[in-house]
Every structure is written in structure tokens, then in C-alpha cells.
Amino acid sequence: MAFGKSHRDPYATSLGHLIEKATFAGVQTEDWGQFMHICDIINTTQDGPKDAVKALKKRISKNYNHKEIQLSLSLIDMCMQNCGPSFQSLIVKKEFVKDTLVKLLNPRYTLPLETQNRILSFIKMWSQGFPGGVDVSEVKEVYLDLLKKGVQFPPLDGEPETKQEAGQISPSRPTSVPTAPALSSIIAPKNPTISLVPEQIGKLHSELDMVKMNVKVMTAILMENTPGSENHEDIELLRKLYKTGREMQERIMDLLVVVENEDVTVELIQVNEDLNNAILGYERFTRNQQRLLEQKRNPTEANQTSSEPSAPSCDLLNLGPVAPVPVSSEGPLNSVNAQLSGLNVSSQSPVITNNLYPSLQPQMDLLASEDTEVPTLFPQRTSQNLASSHTYDNFPDHSSSVLLQPVSLHTAPAAPSSQRLPPLPSNHPVLKNSALQPPSYYEVMEFDPLAPTTEAIYEEIDASHKKGAQSHSEC
């Protein structure tokens, strides 16, 4: 791009560069010919209005150079008189008026009183409107806000003096350029300002009292009625008051622009705020009415939404009486109990014991094992079922003791066939563990003296241990 500037720089465009040169502080006086050339470019190019407003905003924003501000205001004044609505509508936006021009009134910029009055005159004059349907609502809002803050605007009749001073600075200004007074005669009413006499002020106050009364009635009706259960007579009256309030608000806005009396202006601003709140309340009321009517037109949808639970039915708790459901995890346990309860311990069931290291008192071991078992697994296990026909004479009697049948320590037949126990499998962990341990000859082994066998038990134990040791050594 020309001049080595980025596209975001407002001065990068050809029009922006012209505005930068025309408002430079090194220029002694306004170059009206250059100003007219800028106006022609704005009117003949599509992006001219946007580029011009961006360049002017950059020149004015945070600028402490009074000369550049004065030249920029002169260029704005000429462009507003000679450019079309596309440029004028951008200038009267709140973004430019409030965020750019009004900020120059801050005391830190120390603008001369003449320059400050010129800015205020622009705001007041623009708020009165332009031909061509330019929306001036935003600049009018800024004007009313300044009035509310107590800012005193200079009369528009004083603008010719300002222009006359500007003419003295530049005697070479072309005569074809219209001045501010000519603009006022074109776009402003014949009587831009009104000086109210006491009779007019009294009549205005009476009309404002009527507006206040209407606002109170509207507020009371809105508070007493709710959408869906409203009184038709009240609603009809409310509609009439709303229509009248809209008309009164337009008149108040017009009076705020032309009335010079400060006390009257303050009163108009206050009444306008109250009336605006009542109008907004009525519009909110009508929106709620419309929403209720739409819901009544679709009652099925409303019923469906109201009857739907807040959570899925599968997640809701059933607080009613429910029959107890058996827990599935207890099924295997109950089946095991049923199988074990049918067993008879005194029958020819295999009993797994440690054949190599039997206890000295197997009956006491059984008692200890019965104390450690889970009672629910053996509900039908009693001392009568475990009673045996063989007992020891030298063993002390216990009230709850249960005696076992004698068990042989070898696989050879040492008892009648009816009392014989089946041998353990060769891969049983008991036999595997015993095969890894050397034989011990110092353990006292107890045997049943009543058993019908005469074979030496110790020899067979030694033989079995030796066989296990040999197999272990071979591995």
C-alpha cells in the first residue's frame, strides 16, 4: 500500500491521507478548496463515508493539539453541509459523538471556550434532525444526557459570530460554500429556540401534571392485573393510555430540543423518564399476554411438558410396599448348604487329612475346626451325626466332644471293607508337599490299637518317605 502503512490505518487510504494532510497542525489556515475536494470524494466513492469518519476519529481522539482539533471541526462542519445522508448518519452515531467529540470537553484537554461551544453547538444542531431521513436518535440521546448533567448549550444564534471569526482567519474561503447559518435556515425550524413566557410555562406544567397522572394510572393497572386474569376494562383503558403516552413522549422530546428554560428542561427530562418506564412496563405486559395465548393454543404440548417427570422413571425410588426379592448372589451359597446338609459324616465319606503328620488328638482338632467353620454352611451338623462306634478309653470325656472313626495312615487294607477310605490322588497338594520333605523318625505317631491289623506302621511310613525322597532326588 502507498505510504508504507497497514490496511488498518485510517490514513492508509487515499481519502484518509488527504484528511491527514488537511488537518495537520502545520497548516496555518483552513484550506477550503481541499475541504471541498474531500467532500467530493466522500460523495462519489462507496467507501468514502466510512474512510472519512475513521480518519476524522483518529485525528480527534486523544489529541491535545488545539490547532488540529480546530481544523478537524471545520472539516466536519463543511462535510455535514455538503455530503449526503450516508456520511451524516455515521457522524451522528453515539460512537462518534459521545466517544469522540464529547470526550474533548474533558478539562485535561484544556480546549478554549470557543472550541467547546462549537462542539456543543454541533450536538444541539444535529439533534434537531436532517433532511433525507437521517436517524438522529443517538445524538439526541447524547444531547439529553448532557442536559441532565447540567451542561449549558450555547444558543444557535451565536454560531454566526463563530463563523465570522473563522472567516477572518481565512479571507480566501470560497463564497459558494454554505455556512452554518445557511444550514440552520435549511434543516432547522424557523424558530430553533423558544423562550417561554410565564403563561406558556404554566400551561406546560399543567400538561406535564396530566402526563404524571396518566403514568400513575398505568402503573396501578399494571400492578393490579396479571397476564391471563386481567380485567378487560382495565386493559382497554391501558391501551388508550399507552397510545396517549407515546404521543406525549414525542412532544416532550421535541420540547427538549427547542426549550431554553433550564428549569423546564429538567422537569421535561424527569417526566420523560417516568413515562418511558410506564411504556416499557406495558410492552412487557403485552409480551407476557402473547406468550400465554400461544401456550393455550397448544395445550397438549404444555400438558406433556408439565406431566413429564424431572428424572427417568427407572431412576425414581419406589416407596410403596414391595415383596422381598431374593438376592442372586446367595443362590450358590444356598445350594451348597442344601448339598452339605444331606451328607452324613458317619457314613463312608472320604475325609482328607494329613497322612504323614497326623495329630496326637484328632478329636480335638475336629472340635477346633468346627468352631472355626461358618455356621450357616452346616446347619444340620450335630454331635449325633458324628457319633462313632470306636472310642478311646484313656481320652478325657467332653460334654460336646465328637469322636472320629480311626483312619489308616497307609493305602494297604488295614480295616474292613466297610470302613475303608479311598486313597488320595497322586497329584493332591498334600502328597506333593510331603514328597518334598525328608522323613522324620522322632515324631510320635498314634494309631488305633483296636484296628484289626498287625502290620508295622512305622516301617510303612519310612518306606513311603523314602519313596518320596527318591522321587524328589530323581527330579
UniProtKB/Swiss-Prot annotation:
It is a peripheral membrane protein. Residues 442-445 are annotated as: Interaction with PIK3R1. A motif (SH2-binding) lies at residues 458-461. Residues 22-154 form the VHS domain. A motif (SH3-binding) lies at residues 421-425. Signal peptide: none annotated. Residues 155-175, 296-317 are annotated as: Disordered. CDD domains: GAT_TM1L1, VHS_Tom1L1. GO terms for biological process: negative regulation of mitotic nuclear division; protein transport; signal transduction. Gene3D superfamilies: 1.20.58.160, 1.25.40.90. Residues 392-395 are annotated as: Interaction with GRB2. It is found in: Golgi apparatus, Golgi stack; Endosome membrane; Cytoplasm; Membrane. Residues 165-175, 300-310 have a biased composition (Polar residues). Residues 199-287 form the GAT domain. GO terms for cellular component: cytoplasm; cytosol; endosome; endosome membrane; Golgi stack; membrane. PANTHER family: TOM1-LIKE PROTEIN 1, VHS DOMAIN CONTAINING PROTEIN FAMILY. This is TOM1-like protein 1. The gene is Tom1l1.
